[in-house]
Design a protein with these regions (language model features):
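Short, well-ordered alpha-helix to beta-strand connector turns
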Residues: 151, 261, 355, 403, ...
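Conserved short alpha-helical segments that host acidic/polar catalytic motifs at enzyme active sites
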Residues: 31, 55-312, 316, 320-357, ...
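Short, solvent-exposed amphipathic alpha-helical segments in soluble enzyme
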Residues: 79-83, 235-238, 266, 373-379, ...
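Active-site phosphate/pyrophosphate-binding segments
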Residues: 321-325, 329-359, 449-566
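Hydrophobic alpha-helical scaffolding
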Residues: 66-69, 158, 178, 195-199, ...
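Glycine-rich phosphate-binding loops that contact phosphosugars or nucleotide phosphates
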Residues: 350-487, 493-501
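Generic beta-strand/beta-sheet core signal
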Residues: 157, 222, 233-234, 242-244, ...
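Intrinsic disorder/low-complexity segments
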Residues: 1-57
Length: 566
């Protein structure tokens, strides 16, 4: 314990987590302390690295990279605007031209890049951009991305956590390198620059650096010494490559790509893509083995990521729920047969019939949906179900039996803790099913089978339509499993009819928007809310409380109604 007790969980220390920036600084302070005392705190250091990878992974930065024949800066700027919903505290752009690389960045909003730094006028037909939410170092101009190497000829943007950055930084400082920021990302840029000096190859320098790195990354690298090349790589942080007409766009989210192309490659973990201005590209592992990544097509339309006349994305998505719920049933729900067709599960049909236990793992809102799924599956299929926080699942060495089926639920399909949970389950021999919204996401690729939500892009940070779509899919899954396990056709038909009526009932509620506004106004001065529910409505109470906390920052708690008397 000793002096480490200054980081004890006091009310003052917990209070700082109301501000992400202060929270990150607090975590940095702890990390610095533990590294300085790692000989006596080796266990704490390892635990802290795992904790920060999960906690800080919640704050998603945005990446855009472009190489082609058009002016890069306006394309990158528009891409960053598409990623603003992810949350950030600073932004920046780097372009590559005959004069070298030019970086303009600052703390603040993407709009500030244009209003104060005039980034759209930056020259060059290739470049990278970034929106940052601080993980190492406070939000200020030097800590903003992109970061350059010591020579000023290489630049990168990076999402993720470099867990061993202090070790690498000490070696670089000893070799005479200096740093302008407090970030782990600049350490990686300088490291790549040093390796480029040794190898003369940007690809080789990036690959060698990433082999040495512990942690997670989604990154894009450019160099004025190889101006016709751009390199992207990922491990634990999503990165998508858009393929246009003799042009390429890297992004952390397909929403930044769709305005330019619908053809994309979703990079896998420990995979890199090397793209060239002449329109050619290759993908390979970080270990330099060739890979064959399939070209896929973005399914959603551009207007799906526009506000469509609403003041907020969240409000738009709330009003989309009648349609998104219906889309989750389309082609699946067989009302007269009282059954469901889920083609994505055909490969695991035998495993579902033989299943003796189902484990559902998820985080946040998806965990609340999983609790509803527990009620439904046990009621309709009479199979025992356990619901696990993905963030806790792998750390307790879970017992997985031969006929267990694990279901992973995630809107994005990229939730780091849920990914770690499914990898643990697969390692222990479980059949793993994914229920995700984003086509081509990592969870969709790594599970044995799965079901898409078909909710369309969810831009709002607080989940709405994805939650109801998860309930839609879970209900159909429970019905399918029930019919496999002896549930009668008449019972199935009755449930299917009720499920089919839900979109209309959602619409009826949304039509009462004035009543809802009046209720909100009446209770707007309250400082505490208690959401109560029993049975299947207890998870709904948890979700309701979470929504109020997320959006209003008013304290709210979901609680089992029957427990009030205790």
């Amino acid at each position: 314990v000793g002096s480490f007790s200054r980081f004890r969980p006091t009310p003052a220390n917990f209070a700082i987590f109301a501000s992400p920036n202060r929270a990150h600084q607090f975590l940095d302070d702890i990390h610095e302390y533990v590294v300085q005392h790692q000989s006596t705190n080796a266990f704490v250091l390892g635990s802290f690295a795992r904790f920060t990878s999960g906690f800080l992974g919640f704050f998603m930065c945005g990446i855009v990279g472009y190489i082609g024949a058009q002016a890069a800066a306006p394309i990158i700027l528009n891409g960053l605007r598409r990623l603003e919903y992810r949350g950030y505290d600073s932004a920046g752009i780097c372009t590559v031209s005959v004069g070298g690389i030019e970086i303009r960045k600052r703390a603040g909003k993407v709009a500030d890049l244009e209003s104060t730094l005039h980034v759209s006028a930056m020259e060059g037909t290739s470049g990278i951009g970034h929106t940052r939410w601080a993980t190492h170092g406070v939000p200020n101009n030097p800590n903003a991305h992109p970061h350059a190497d010591a020579s000023g000829t290489i630049a990168l943007v990076h999402n993720g956590i470099i867990e061993n950055y202090l070790t690498i930084k000490k070696k670089l400082v000893k070799a005479g390198y200096a740093f302008a920021s407090e970030t782990d990302s600049e350490v990686l840029a300088v490291f790549i620059g040093m390796l480029f000096e040794q190898t003369g190859s940007l690809e080789q320098a990036v690959r060698t650096a990433l082999v040495e790195v512990d942690g997670t990354f989604g990154l894009v690298v450019v160099s004025s010494q190889e101006p016709d090349v751009m390199i992207g790589a990922r491990r634990g942080s999503p990165l998508v490559l858009g393929i246009g007409n003799n042009e390429f766009i890297f992004a952390s989210d397909a929403s930044a790509i769709i305005a330019h192309t619908r053809q994309v490659v979703y990079l896998h973990d420990n995979e890199m893509a090397i793209v060239h201005r002449n329109g050619t590209y290759v993908t390979k592992t970080i270990g330099n083995e060739a890979t064959e990544s399939a070209i896929e097509e973005i399914e959603f339309e551009l207007d799906a990521i526009e506000k469509g006349g609403f003041d907020h994305f969240m409000l738009k998505e709330i009003f989309e729920q009648p349609n998104t719920f219906r889309d989750g049933m389309r082609g699946r729900l067989q009302i007269e047969d009282g059954n469901v067709r889920l083609g994505g599960l055909s490969a695991v049909g035998d495993a579902l019939r033989a299943a003796q236990r189902i484990i559902i793992t998820a985080c946040g809102t998806s965990w609340h949906a999983a609790l509803v799924g527990e009620y439904l599956i046990e009621t309709l299929a009479r199979i025992p179900v356990e619901v696990e926080y993905a963030s806790e699942f792998r750390y307790r060495n879970p017992i997985i039996l031969p006929h267990d089926v694990v279901i992973a639920i995630s809107q994005s399909g990229e939730t780091a803790d849920t990914l770690a949970a499914i990898r643990e389950a697969k390692m222990k021999g479980a059949t793993v099913i994914g229920m995700v919204n984003v086509v081509g996401s990592t969870i969709a690729r790594e599970t044995d089978a799965g079901v898409y939500l078909h909710a369309g892009p969810e831009i709002g940070v607080a989940s709405t339509k994805a939650f109801t779509s998860q309930l839609c899919v879970l209900t159909q899954f429970a019905l399918l499993l029930g019919r496999m396990r002896g549930l009668g056709q008449s019972e199935g038909r009755a449930l299917a009819k009720e499920l089919d009526a839900i979109p209309m009932k959602i619409q009826n509620i949304l039509d009462r928007v004035e009543d809802i506004e009046n209720i909100a106004h009446e209770y707007s001065s309250a400082s505490n809310f208690l959401y109560l529910g029993r049975g299947v409505n207890f998870p709904v109470a948890l979700e309701g409380a979470l929504k109020l906390k997320e959006i209003s920052y008013i304290h709210a708690e979901g609680y089992p109604a029957a427990e009030m008397k205790h």
